[in-house]
Amino acid sequence: ASGVIKCKAAVAWEAGKPLSIEEIEVAPPKAHEVRVKIIATAVCHTDAYTLSGADPEGSFPVILGHEGAGIVESVGEGVTKFKPGDTVIPLYIPQCGECKFCLNPKTNLCQKIRVTQGKGVMPDGTSRFTCKGKQVLHFMGTSTFSEYTVVADISLTKINASAPLDKVCLLGCGVSTGYGAALNTAKVEPGSTCAVFGLGGVGLAVIMGCKVAGASRIIGIDLNKDKFAKAKEFGATECISPADFKKPIQEVLIEMTDGGVDYSFECIGNVGVMRAALEACHKGWGVSVIVGVAAAGQEIATRPFQLVTGRTWKGTAFGGWKSVESVPKLVDEYMSKKMKVDEFVTHTLPFEQINEAFELMHAGKSIRSVLKF
């Protein structure tokens, strides 16, 4: 591997402050690490959640970002699966292929580097980023808000070199998460009725997954009616706003669907909505999947009777996809027009306008903003 690289990055110096575009130093990759030139990255609510200071695992200063795509610049010692020039997507859930999680077909939650990743450092306990003489932390094992980043070789997957990186970067998180929540976690069946709470990027991806699975009714639920048209483009058969009803939304859905939905999905991260989503499920077989990440310290509640009478409450991370093996297949599905990705991108901005991308997201004006270096 070559030496230190100086490049642009968006540094989060402290919680609650805008990101700052800085020149940083990126050290060469150590053993089993890869240095990647990021070509495009998108902004996700998880980045904003950590930046806000609400994330108990959040530490500063840090380089955020976990939806990106790029090209391998150099590889560290012992790296066999990548070479300079490979087209890649960094993965916030790795796949080592060896831990008991990777060996179990029921989960995608590889734990090999979980502890160090949570602390914002590489597996050897140190960072590859410095700025103005200070160490800057990594984020989710990816740190895509930098022109160059260093990732563990298990946190990376090689994809079709002809894929447009300013689109497929979304497969690093939101689109894959929602799509897999429907296909892998819920395992939606043909002819079923689904309810999707929250019509942001992840909610739209859930709708897309439900449609691919053959659901006959897909009900979108959001307070913001501006989101309804897009939801219908993705496959929602009807959309409702809780603000239009006096009674709780779960009661409305139970009436609309003759007893409740077969599958519901919470794509917001609000524990009150999680309860409504469960209680909107049909007695005897309804399944509710939690996709949204709730704030620290929040707890879910319902009456045990809801579960005793045959409803199931589940959660999902990254759509249940085993990352290294699945993301290249998702890219191929997109390339063969089997799944939508372009339609999620509402704004494309130069990297320097990253704070504007956060503002668009907070204002509900964007689904996904993609930043290009």
Swiss-Prot record:
Residues at the site labelled Important for FDH activity and activation by fatty acids: R114
Pfam annotation, one family: ADH_zinc_N
Entry note: cofactor: Binds 2 Zn(2+) ions per subunit.
Cofactor: Zn(2+)
Record key words, sorted: Acetylation, Cytoplasm, Metal-binding, NAD, Oxidoreductase, Zinc
Quaternary structure annotation from Swiss-Prot or TrEMBL: Homodimer.
Record's protein name: Alcohol dehydrogenase class-3
Organism: Saara hardwickii
